[in-house]
Amino acid sequence: MRRTRLTRHAIAVTGVLVGALALLLGPTATAQAADECTTRTTTKAFATFGDTNDYFPIGGGTFESGSLSNFVVTGGASVTGENEPWRVLGSWHTRSAALPPGATLQATFCVQIGEDSMRLFAKSPSNAGGSLTIKTTVATAYGSAMTSSTVGSKSSAWTPTPAIPLVNVSGPDGKQYVTLLVTNNGSGTWLVDDILVDPWKTR
């Protein structure tokens, strides 16, 4: 079986001063994200791939509810009945998110000091040459920073992404808010599953 080759290009990190966090995210997004900073149920989700760090899912990031209510979506993104094959969060998991060409999936969630990277699973379409862009914008009242990763594949198979850094610009409470934007830049449908954050700097 051919193994999917993922590439990550040009992780750019930039910093710029911004206004208050409420102006960046809006009151609803801020309140929802703050709730997610209170509970951490972790698992060694990527141990099969040599990564023994602990991870926890972002709100709605397993897609098992069948809803994308935790996300802002465009371009017909939806929940589909296919899971990443390792079922790292439970054998009963059966769903993922499908992103048709041009579709986007966006979520805002809270992280704390030391929660400095994330990973997810992606499945490329059968036609070669497509790509998935994963952008993170980290924001606090002190400032913001962005990372951008491009994932490409030459075969159709599920695979974990490399670690995606979350830049530390945490506020006085030790928290910061991440907006994740996943964009399908290809001509076929990508699947995305199990969006997970590494809660401690264990590397």
Where are these regions (language model features)?
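C-terminal segment of classical bacterial N-terminal signal peptides
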Residues: 20-30
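Extracellular beta-strand-rich recognition modules
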Residues: 63, 116-124, 175-184
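Extended, low-complexity, turn-rich repeat/linker tracts enriched in Gly/Pro/Ser/Thr and Asp/Glu
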Residues: 71-73, 98-100, 111-115, 123-132, ...
